[in-house]
Amino acid sequence: MAYRRKSAFKRAIDEDDVDIIRKLLSYKPIDLNKPGSKNRTILCRAVSMKSHKVAEFLLSNGSKMSACKVPPLIISVRNKDLTMAKILVSYGASVDVCYKGETPLLTAIKTGYIEIIDYLLSLEPSGPYPGHDMIYDKLTLESCSLLIKNNIRLDIPDRYGHTALYYAVKKGNLSLIKLLVENKAITDNIERIKILRRCIVTHYNIEVLKILSLDRDILGTEGTTALHYAVEAERLEAVRYLLDIGCDPKVLDEHSVSPLYYAIKRKNKIILDELIKFYTVEFMVNMDKRTLPLAMYYCSIDELKNLMHGIKDIALSEDYLSELLYESIKTNNPEIVSLILGLGANINKRDLYGNIPLQTAIIYQTDNVFNLLLQKGADVNAKNSDGNTILHTLAACCKYKKIKLVLDLGSDINSVNTNGRTPIEEACPCKKTIRTLISHLIIMIKKNKELIKDPLVIRSVSFINGIEYYKNIMLQCENELNELINQKLVRGYSLFDFVIEKDYNVIARFVNHPKLKVLKQTANVYKELADKNIGMSLTRYTLLERAVLTTEPYLHMLPLEIRSIICCFLSNNELEKL
């Protein structure tokens, strides 16, 4: 019997038959607010089945909307049932009722039923909150217009930090974007950045950008601007458009760099040409300070000269010049390094890491620049923050050819660093490196006997004697030099003097001496030094002989000896030009 009565109730509700409901209730009254098997009240079923008459009857006879698990007004909106919604509101349904973060207005927006949205908005709801984060991507132009018309805020970020404008940009809905932009439906600077990144970087759309540009506040965010993103993403069309509408290319982002910096970093010559006309070297030196150092590394010499046009008329700080120099060293381009040195950069100034330019050239293996720095007069005895000279660095890196070069330029082999260690002590155990260092030390001692009394020399010799392999090299050097000292070319002048001689006019006198052949055959440790001076003696002698003969028609009135003396004052290059 109870089952039949229950079935009759369901049929009456489904058929919206109030008379049957009334008869059933008069026969045996029941609790209208008691949930059924599916945890739903009779009113819930009536609302779900769009039974308007039954729902109104139930409400007038004590059914409470609060007894329903899901608010009836939300159910009616889900069903797009405007009539039911009006009935429920007439019996006190709250337009701001919320179920699991969902309000009637939010539900209406999700369904896209404009008539219900319009009706609910006429009831002055507080908004589609708290579940607004579920509807931004469901907005249509019509629903958005209604919300804006009724002053419903669309600039509150959802749980992902996005606003309605972001989702409109994501879908590429130009009409909706325009509506939101015109009504300032935008939030903080972070949201602006997300929107710009989406329409320029990740999902490029120039039409969206053009609409966003209607609100210049969106393009000119605090720090990173639309132009920064366009340049960084290499969107040439966007760059040209933004420049045409007057976007300021001199704005610095949160990293204190301008769009020009990113154009250089991307090596995009076309965009670089579009931007460069807006910049002056004064701006780059005083404001956009990271751009020129970057340009040292990425630009060609011609592009760099174009960027730096007029820089000589600007007073540059020593630190800034030093930064430019260190960046130019990394390029291994002597022309660029020469350009910076020509501006007055200190060739021996330490960088932020305490290194000197010569050491930076070794670190970055820029051999051409290393040689240029030496030619420009870099101090081979300058020390870094650890007290290491370039000789310490070269010895540790086994650069034996460069070791010979800096030793010839006067690098101090006995210099100590902050740890009290000399280049020989810091040297990597490489045969050629150790041999180069020890042979130089021994030849210094042979040239000047007083050096053996120097504490630093004593320290170096003591260190060498402490390692058998080093000691053997030292003994080999001493024996070879002693043999050279005993071989006299003339009275008071030995083969040793010939090997260490720097005056080419002197060694030219011995070009045909028979003992030079002996020197060439017997030299071992000092073979390179001996061969160099033997070759130079022949070269110098040949040039002098030819010069004397060449000048005879012009200086025939002078004795041969005088002409020879005059020619001796000329360098080899000058003699070759005669």
Swiss-Prot record:
Q: Which Pfam families match?
A: Ank_2, PRANC
- Signal peptide boundaries: none
InterPro entries, alphabetized: Ankyrin_rpt, Ankyrin_rpt-contain_sf, PRANC_domain
Q: What organism does the record attribute this protein to?
A: Fowlpox virus (strain NVSL)
Question: ANK repeats located where?
Answer: 4-34, 38-67, 68-97, 100-129, 160-189, 222-251, 255-287, 320-349, 353-382, 386-415, 419-449
Alphabetically ordered keywords of this record: ANK repeat, Repeat
- Which SUPFAM superfamilies is this protein grouped with? Ankyrin repeat (SSF48403)
* UniProt protein name: Putative ankyrin repeat protein FPV022
